[in-house]
Structure formats: structure tokens, C-alpha cells
């Protein structure tokens, strides 16, 4: 029996103010775990897969049920421990300790590879938590859309004078992360062709309004692109096809996109990337029969796609790796110059990280969209002098469809996050929100990840692979009073390539919550400033001094 497959279940988080657990501090992780598996949120909820290839919310359905049971029973001075999606212990701690501690997919470095992970996975001893799948703070494609938007806008500033009108972006992948790309592109003023091999993913992005059109052939997609250019309006097109075939074909035809990237699940060559020339049915059968052959065929196909991306790069077209480790896979297959084009963080995002700015997110546990709209207004009130942020919030309200529990993301940094958290808590206390909110972030943040091919690529001091930083981030968030804290391995880029930490904190309107919020939402982004200041970035050093951080040898 497959303990991970249950087509009979439909999971949706409870809404409203009635509790099924003993407090909001345990009701919150319960609802957010369930929300991760809402069919409007998750990629394959019947298999517990949230996004990112095989990124799961729980190890199997028995573990899922036991986690819910433990959360319902958990006391105010107890902490639940979760090991790779399985509840393993409840211990007496204290009221300000995290209610849940999560460790997902962590392996001793010498064994930190997909082969060993899959051996353990088959034995039922481990699961892949991705970043926010196994840490119960995934909010659908909105979770990455602003970061993608910021990246495209910055690329437009650097390469096209700040104007992407009439230009188009080529990419691959419309999964949980890649699905944000089409909306981010049109928000930034550009059109997009996003190549996706799975029809259901295209349909999901159309249904949730992240995508405008579907094309079944490259010629059809190009015709749609030309029509949009004539009309003067950006359009996003989901092209049913294989990026490994479409990218080289565009090179052969001499067709020039204006920006090229990729968000296929290349980090997982067995489950995440369709080899060139294969059907979906053959791929599924081969994954069961010979996963090693699948991985080899996928990596060879990735090499072909990266060669095409390098061809675009040599034409002078901006090309960026969007953090799925496709360059490393291609390099493994003999593409020696795979890293000639940059990753998106060193190219466009690092100055934000130096100031602790990253993907701050919150969700309304009530299920009421009005709670999000009220918090949107509060963000504008508290940060009145940031027109770019206000523009983002206006666009988000107009364009972004909520998936599951209503949620919002906006990139804010040190000195802003704790003020917002305290304000949201006060809104709950005054009854301006109909239930508490949870506040969290992606593991892709300034101080919470070590990933040499993504977030920490090309660090100034060469410390790309030093993973002490996310460990310190997790420890500090525990000490500061986060409601749940997670420590993962392999998210985004695959086994052996990253370690990262997450935190979530509940604003329930109490004085105790206010104290925790002030500590956590100051300390968490401050670790990002610390990490970048330690690496020698002047922006981070200045930010640390401006905010009075005590960094021995740097600010002292």
C-alpha cells in the first residue's frame, strides 16, 4: 500500500475564530499545515506534495494525522518535534519556546546526495521538505511573485533603461515557484513565454490568474507574442512543451528574447525535469523502473538547455539562473562554461539582502480576505515613504488571487518587520482583524540560507558554502520566541547544495505575543545584515551601524 497516496482526501484549513486546538499558538501551525495541502494551493495534495518536485508537507498520511492530533493536544508549555515530516516527540519546555520544531531532509554532508536520500525515502525514513512545504508556510505562487517581480524590474533597470514595455522573457517551468513568473513579468511590463510540460500546471496558473494564455505550439505562442506587441499590452503565455527542446529551437531559428531564465524543477533530476523526447507517461513509468536512467537522461537534456541559454548569453541577451541548480547539472554533464551567466541573487537581489530586506509574508487565519486588505492599509500607513512598496500592494490586490487562506507578501527589512508585526498584533487585540495572523517568510531570505549556487553565490569573502549562518538564524529564532522554527537541507537547488532555516510567529493580540514579535522580527532580519556585514559588504556594515547592531569587530 502506498502510504503517501490518498485520492479520497480533500484537505482545507479551518476558517473562522473557533479553535480545534488548545490555543492560537497551536491552532496556527495546524491550519497552516492543512493549508499547504489545500487543492487550490498544493501541486499534488493527494500525495502530500506541495511544490518543487517532491516537496512535501508531511512524510505520509499517517504522520499527517498524528501531527494534527499532537497539535490539537499540545499544551501551552510543550513543544512538538517533527523529523522529516513525522512527529517524533512532545517535550515540556516553556511558554515562550517554539510550539513546534521541525528538521527536514538533513543528512551528514558525506551522504548528502539524491541517491542516499532516495534510499531513505523509499524506506519511509525521510521526506523532502523543500523550503516552505515542510515548514508549513507556503502560500501558493504569491509567495515568490514579488521576489520574481523585483528581479525582473531590476533586470529592466540594468539592461533596458527601466522600461520592459514591448519586451519579452523566455523561461521554463510553471510549478509552485515557476508559476509566479508570468504574473511577475506582466506586472513588470514584459510579456513572457513560459514552457511547461504538464498541462495541469498550465491550467492551474490560468485558473488562479497567474497566466493569461495557453499555446500548444511554439508558432502559436510566437504569434500571440506578436499580437500583444502590436496591441501594446504585455501577455503571459504558457507553452505546452519541453524547455529542453524549445530553448534550442529558438536559438536555431535566430529568435531573440529580451531576458532568458528557467524555473523548471531541475534541482531534482528524477522527479522534476522531463528528458527531451520523452512523453509524460514514459517518464512516469521510468521513474518507477529505473530512476538512475531518468536522472542521467534529464541531466543530458538540461545540458542542452543550458547550452542554448549560453548561446543567448553570447548574443548579449541577459540570462540568469533562477536558483534551480540547472547550471550545476549541466556542468556535471560536461558544459564547462555553464556558470558563465550569473544567478539572480548576485546579479539583482544582494543589495536588498544586505539591508535585511526579503520576503516577509503573513496569512489570515480567519480565512477572511478583508483581514488582508486591512493589513495592506496598515503597511502603507506605517511605511508611508516607499512608493514602490505601495505600488506593489496595489498591484497585488488587483492581480493576485488568494490560494487557500488569504495571505500577502511584501519585501521589507530590518526596522520594518517588527513594527508591522506589532501593529498587526494590536489590530487583533482591538478586534480590527477577525482572528490572529501568522507572520513568516521564505527560507530564501538574507540571513537564513547557505546555498552557493543561489542565495550565497559569489559572496565577497568566498564564504558561499559556510552553513553556520542558517544554523545560527534558527537557534536565535528559537531563543527569541518564534512559534515554529524549521531547519532544512536541499531546498531549491537539491540535495547537497543548500541548508536553510525558517520561522513563523503568531500575532494573537496578547502582550506576550507582542514581546515575542518584537524580538523575533528584529533579530531574524538582523542576522541577514550580520551575515553580509561579516562578508564585507559596505551596505550591510552601514545598515548595522545605523540600526545599532552589536557586531564585534564590525560595529564595535
Swiss-Prot record:
The active site is at 410. Transmembrane segments: none annotated. Its main location: cytoplasm. Keywords: Cytoplasm, Histidine metabolism, Lyase, NAD. GO terms for biological process: L-histidine catabolic process to glutamate and formamide; L-histidine catabolic process to glutamate and formate. Binds 1 NAD(+) per subunit. It comes from the Bacteria. Its cofactor is NAD(+). The keyword Cytoplasm applies. Pathway: Amino-acid degradation; L-histidine degradation into L-glutamate; N-formimidoyl-L-glutamate from L-histidine: step 2/3. It catalyses: 4-imidazolone-5-propanoate = trans-urocanate + H2O. NCBIfam families: hutU, PRK05414.1. Belongs to the urocanase family. Catalyzes the conversion of urocanate to 4-imidazolone-5-propionate. This is Urocanate hydratase. The gene is hutU.
